[in-house]
A protein has these predicted regions:
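C-terminal helical subdomain
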Residues: 199-200, 218-293
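The beta1-alpha1 cofactor-binding region of Rossmann-like NAD(H)/NADP(H)-dependent oxidoreductases
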Residues: 54-55, 75-87
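Catalytic loop of short-chain dehydrogenase/reductase
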Residues: 107-111, 119-124, 128, 154-192, ...
Length: 293
C-alpha cells in the first residue's frame, strides 16, 4: 500500500543542497516536514570550497509553507547522539508516527574535490563517515521502533556512484559503499514490518554549490553538468516512490535516481529527463540474499 496522505516526513541536511531540494520537490499540501540542519536562522551563510553559500532551515521552511506543507525547522548536530534521540522522542510525542526519513546530511570537507591522493588531504576527510554514514545509523536506530510499530514506512539514503567507482578518494567511497550495504542490511531487518530501506544514487545535482563551482571549471566539466538534475528532482522521485502501492519491492535495493524517475514518467522541472551516469560511472550490483545471524 502507498503511504498515507498528510505524511510526517523527516529530511536531514535540509538547510541547503540536495536536502533542501528534496524537501521542496517532495512536499505536498498537508504534509508535516521536519527539516534538520546546523544552520537555523535566515541569512546564515557557510564557506565551502572557497565559496559563500546561503544556508538556513528558516529559508527552506518559508518555501515549504508556500506549498501548503507544515514545516518544522529543527536545529540538529548529527554528531550528537543525544540530540538525535531527543528529536525522535519529540516526533513520537507530537505526531505519534514517522512515515518517511530521507538521510541527506553530509559533512563535507574543503579537500573533497582536490585532485590529490588521500594522504595529502586533511585527515578530517573521515568526517564524511561520521555525518553521512554513522549519523544515518544512529537516527535510523532511534526511529526504527516507531516505524516498526506502525508497520509501514520508508527510509531513503542519498548515496552516489562513488560507491562503485573512484570518486573524491577513499573516505568518500567508504561512506557511500557503507551506506549502500547498511541500507540493504536494514531492509533485511525491516522486512517483516513493511518498512522499506532504499539507497538512491543522486547523480549530478545542480544545487547552489555545483552552479558556483562550475564557473571555475573547464568546458568539459561544464558540459558534463548539462545532463544533471535540478535541486528538486530527487524530491519528485522520492514522492512518487512513496505513492507506489508496491514500494516494498525496492527495499534493500540500490537505485539510480534518474532511472527510477524515468520508470515513473517523471520529468525534471524544465521538462527534461536528467541523465543516468551508469555507462560512465558504473551501476549498482545486488547484494547476496544469504543471511548469517
Amino acid at each position: 500500500m502507498a503511504l498515507k496522505k498528510n505524511r510526517v516526513i523527516l529530511i536531514t541536511g535540509a538547510s541547503r543542497g540536495v536536502g533542501k531540494g528534496v524537501a521542496l520537490g517532495f512536499a505536498r499540501k498537508g504534509d508535516t516536514i521536519i527539516i534538520t540542519g546546523r544552520s537555523l536562522v535566515k541569512g546564515t551563510s557557510v564557506s565551502q570550497f572557497g565559496l559563500t553559500l546561503e544556508s538556513s532551515l528558516e529559508s527552506t521552511a518559508e518555501a515549504l509553507s508556500k506549498i501548503g506543507a507544515h514545516p518544522i525547522a529543527y536545529q540538529l548536530d548529527q554528531n550528537n547522539d543525544e540530540e538525535v534521540k531527543r528529536l525522535v522522542e519529540m516526533i513520537s510525542s507530537e505526531y505519534g508516527r514517522l512515515d518517511i526519513i530521507v538521510h541527506s546530511s553530509c559533512q563535507i570537507h574543503d579537500d573533497l574535490v582536490k585532485p590529490l591522493p588521500f594522504w595529502k588531504k586533511s585527515i578530517n576527510m573521515w568526517s564524511l563517515v561520521d555525518v553521512g554514514l554513522r549519523s544515518n545509523y544512529i537516527l535510523s536506530y532511534y526511529a526504527a521502533p516507531l516505524m516498526v510499530k506502525q508497520k509501514e514506512g520508508l527510509i531513503i539514503h542519498i548515496s552516489s556512484h562513488g560507491a562503485r567507482c573512484y570518486m573524491h578518494g577513499p573516505a568518500y567511497g567508504a561512506q557511500k559503499a557503507g551506506m549502500d550495504k547498511m541500507s540493504f542490511d536494514m531492509a533485511c531487518d525491516f522486512e517483516p514490518y513493511n518498512v522499506a530501506s532504499i539507497a538512491l544514487w543522486s547523480g549530478i545535482v545542480l544545487d547552489e554549490k555545483t552552479e558556483l563551482v562550475s564557473k571555475n571549471q573547464d568546458d568539459t566539466y561544464v558540459e558534463f553538468l548539462k545532463g544533471g538534475a535540478s535541486q528538486q528532482y530527487a524530491g519528485l522521485v522520492i514522492d512518487s516512490l512513496s505513492q507506489d502501492s508496491d514500494y516494498m519491492r525496492y527495499s534493500g535495493k540500490v537505485l539510480i535516481m534518474q532511472e527510477l524517475g524515468e520508470s515513473y514518467g517523471i520529468k525534471d522541472i524544465e521538462g527534461k529527463n536528467p541523465r543516468s551516469d551508469r555507462s560512465t560511472l558504473g551501476g549498482p550490483v545486488d547484494f547476496e540474499s544469504t543471511k548469517v545471524y
